[in-house]
Amino acid sequence: MAYTDAENAEEEMYKFLDKINDLDISCQGFYLSSGYTQIGNLRCVFHWNKEKFPKPEKFISDFKEKGIHLIPNIKPAFLTSHPMYDEIKKQGLFVKNTDGTPYVTQFWDGLG
């Protein structure tokens, strides 16, 4: 979990690649904790924090080249503060209450 929560997350992940290579440790998959989705102190699904991971496409490709599948942690809700919340609400894509409003409950970082 510490890798994607670090401010220099991408750099730490590449160090991980180097370390397993140096120690000849086999690795076919890596679970990315939700730090890669961070906006401020919040975790916002389907969002790459480009301060931590400036080039996510290259990052994913580099791991794939090494035979490592990245498995991203995806939270089961969009926070009401998520940048795409209003757009998704407008499209009617949320689970709804009986009155037609999006179902909202408490999650780790806020309501979603």
Name the predicted role of every residue range.
Residues 1-112:
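Aromatic-lined carbohydrate-binding/catalytic grooves of carbohydrate-active enzymes
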